[in-house]
Amino acid sequence: MNTEEIRNLLDELYQQKKNPDQVLREISRSTFEDLGFARVDHNRKQRKGFYEVIFCPGKTADQIYRIAAEMMDKKSDVLATRISEEKAAYVLEQIPQAHHNPAARTLSILSRKRTKKGRITIISAGTSDIPVAEEARETCDIMGNRTETIYDAGIAG
């Protein structure tokens, strides 16, 4: 919750448009949203520097979609990792603007365009490391960094 949103809530309380319990509920909701199967941490970016990441193994396609939709509702960037092709297809049907990288096993949604900063080089030793390197690249990209990749840089015995 940003300063303007807090100020608006206080104004509504002062003008008696909302009672103290309603204001407390909204403040509480701004921090975590309980979806029944997951608690979405909306203030993680303020505490840790980046939004919550959806780790997909063990979640259904609908659960991944519902978490992503909740995050989008709060104008958060969305990064889902280790997502299967089937689950990604389901989420893409619901959220066509999502970006899926099958090699990285990621699905991402940017809340807004941003200017990229810095440069991070991701180097993998062998071709079997490419999925992990691609996941790192997608993570760096959504965090607003320019990336460069060098694959299969290792030297086999």
Q: Which role fits each region the language model picked out?
A:
Residues 1-84, 89, 94, 98:
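Long amphipathic alpha-helical segments
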Residues 35-41, 103-111:
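Long, charged amphipathic helices and adjacent flexible linkers at domain junctions
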Residues 48-51, 74-76, 95-96, 103-105, ...:
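Short coil/turn connectors at secondary-structure junctions
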Residues 54-55, 81, 108-110, 123:
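Residues in well-ordered beta-strands of folded domains
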Residues 59, 113, 126:
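A broadly conserved detector of short glycine/acidic/proline-rich loop/turn motifs that flank catalytic sites
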Residues 79-82, 99-105, 109, 149-151:
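General beta-strand structural signal in soluble alpha/beta enzymes
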Residues 87-88, 107, 156-157:
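Short secondary-structure capping/turn micro-motifs that flank functional sites
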Residues 117-157:
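Glycine-rich phosphate/diphosphate-binding loop of Rossmann-like nucleotide-binding domains
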